[in-house]
Amino acid sequence: MMTLKEFGENLKKLNLAYAELKKKYGKPEVGKTIEVAGITWRVLDKLEKGYLVISDEFYGDSREFDDNSNNWDSSDLRNELNTDLRKKIEDSVGEGALLKFTRDLLSMDGQTEYGTCEDYVSILTVDEYRKYRKYLPNMEKWWWLITPHTTPCNNNSSWVQVVSPSGRIDYDDCCGSDGVRPICIFSSSIFESCEEDDD
């Protein structure tokens, strides 16, 4: 059985650990950055159940979207982000830290052939890029968006929208090599203590 002194020492250690975690994660503010799972994330929006964030830097090396299709739902990049990166984040802050969200795969020319899918980790659509552009400074290289240029019903399944270093939207072949800026929704629960302390 633990003595009162041992309990007090353990409580002191827990309080110190809690203070460090609180300092590390801080209270998310739209437009500001937070660090989670060793990655710096820029907060794009405060949603009903969490915070929409984007990696402030490129995640890993430039890579292809997929080797033969501009359909995000079946892409190699989607699989990588929703397995490897999801695991890294959940190993750091626990299961339930990421919220699943719906992705609209509407093409630039209005084709709905690809429909929607649900992700834990994704990349921005063209519409989201435009909506949050004020929080997204220009980067040093091209990076992928989720939006296809068109779909097979218009005889093309390879072009995908990208963002240029100057912030202009263009397109590239799905097997091109571009940067990746993952997005996800962090559950408010991982920041609750910070939010409560600030109220």
Q: How would you label these PLM feature ranges?
A:
Residues M2-D199:
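Collagenous Gly-X-Y triple-helix signature in extracellular proteins
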